Amino acid sequence: LKIAKEKKFAVPAFNAGSGQLLPAIMDACKEEKAPFIMAIHPDELSFLRDSFVAQVLAEINATELPVCLHLDHGANKEQVLHAIQLGFSSVMIDGSSLPYEENVNKPKKLSRLLMLWEFQ
């Protein structure tokens, strides 16, 4: 995102709810030489399965474009950990339905857990 800030352009995020959209997104971004964020919601993962993530990662690894694979609105620790194990480069845990203090503390606790997990 640093280059986007320096050059003053936006980095789009796409939710590809099916494998049919992925090639179109990749082709358009390649044509524009535009970095992008591929966001996948946990509900999409529940019906697309881990094989879809493998397909997305294969496409991402085959391009020279900077691409972020992002878990969009993870609801719990298990979803976040699963996404990281699958190879997501970014995760977001959504605590918006929680009381304010819980919403603030949930990501803090998860961040600490992930830092410990990374060093195992």
Where does each model-flagged region fall?
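Hydrophobic faces of well-ordered beta-strands that scaffold small-molecule active sites
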Residues: A10-N15, F36-I40, V67-H73, V91-I93
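Active-site-adjacent beta->alpha loops and helix N-cap segments on the catalytic face
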Residues: G19-P23, L45-A54, A75-H82, S96-F119
